A protein has these predicted regions:
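S-adenosyl-L-methionine
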Residues: 1-21, 31, 54-82
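Mobile active-site "lid"/loop adjacent to the S-adenosyl-L-methionine
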Residues: 89, 93-111
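Conserved beta-strand signature within the Rossmann-like core of class I S-adenosyl-L-methionine
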Residues: 119, 123-130
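Class I S-adenosyl-L-methionine
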Residues: 137-180
Length: 180
């Protein structure tokens, strides 16, 4: 059985072609950035922590891959991208093994998501891995779910995938695909 993150990767890989512009909105340890770069996509990755950039840069170098790494919040994505995107991925929560006070926030996540939905091409997808077992996580989860549940169904298809018999607030995936 696929984990939510494995399903996110598989769903994105179905639509991403070489040279497509894609976004890692929360680069963290760099795993998603490397995954996207392995697909030969043009990757732009964001994080507010220098540690995340350092870890991602090392992973990319080890894999002999490249991506544009930006030390800035994903809410500023519009300042860096002007062309359409094929896909994006978010891992909401905090950077493991770092300061748990530095977390993604509902307001900035919604701002980034709104901008990326506008930039998303027909058939493009956005994956949101929602980790909410930390202070502030429930608010962000509820805010994101309220927003995506109201996206017009003729324009976007929104799906939720996650375990239902797991303890300790298991993470889940929200996938969005643009229909029009």
């Amino acid at each position: 059985m696929l984990s939510p993150l494995e399903l996110a990767h598989r769903s994105l890989a179905e639509v991403i072609m070489a040279r497509d512009l894609v976004v890692d909105a929360t680069m963290g340890q760099g795993y998603d950035t490397v995954f996207l770069a392995e697909l030969k996509a043009d990757v732009v990755a964001f994080d507010v922590q220098a540690l995340a950039l350092d870890m991602t840069e090392k992973r990319l170098k080890q894999a002999q891959l490249s991506a544009k790494l930006i030390l800035d919040g994903h809410e500023n994505v519009g300042q860096y991208l002007e062309q359409p995107i094929k896909a994006a991925i978010f891992n909401l929560g905090y950077l493991p093994k770092s300061d748990k006070q530095v977390i993604t926030q509902a307001e900035t996540t919604l701002s980034a998501l709104r901008q990326l939905l506008e930039m998303l091409v027909k058939g493009g997808r956005i994956a949101l891995m929602i980790y909410y077992g930390h202070v502030g996580g429930l608010e962000e989860r509820d805010t994101v779910l309220a927003f995506v549940s109201k996206l017009p169904q003729n324009v976007f298809q929104v799906m939720r995938y996650g375990g239902i018999n797991q303890a300790n607030q298991p993470p889940f995936l929200v996938m969005i695909e643009k229909r029009l």
